[in-house]
Amino acid sequence: LLFQFGAIADIHNQAKEKYSPGWKNYFEMAKWLDRNVNGEAVVACGKPSLFHLYANKYTLRYKFANPEEVLKHLEERQVDYVVIDQVYGNTLRYLLPAVQQYPERFQQVQHLTNPDTYLLKFKR
């Protein structure tokens, strides 16, 4: 039982720490989306439940697959926006290659630096 109190204290102390720059931009992008995109929107991103907390939009995870399958999944799920972040390795592994292979299907809406974080409109 005494060991549990130490773990709780550690969690409490971690909660007080600042976010890393990547996470800070991830949440700032979600806040920007909430302020600037009216109505309903579907957003594909790496950590959808966390992004939703600040974006107040419907979020989902993109498919972990080749670029063709990622694009098909975005179309099937009627995605409006995607987030290219620097916090989730699968974004660079799966979502970014789809954006690079089909640049005509994506339009930059917002960009944050240090590290680069992008909100892209998906053209269905």
Where would I find each of the regions flagged by the language model?
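Alpha-helical elements of the RecA-like P-loop NTPase motor core of helicases
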Residues: 3-6, 52-53, 93
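Short periplasmic/luminal acceptor-recognition loop of GT-C membrane glycosyltransferases, typified by
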Residues: 34-63, 81-86
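Transmembrane alpha-helical segments
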Residues: 1-23, 31
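Residues at the C-termini of beta-strands that transition into short coil/loop
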Residues: 2, 47, 63-65, 112, ...
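Periplasmic/luminal catalytic loop of GT-C fold multi-pass membrane glycosyltransferases
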Residues: 67-123
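Flexible, glycine- and charge-enriched loops at secondary-structure boundaries
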Residues: 19, 23, 60, 67
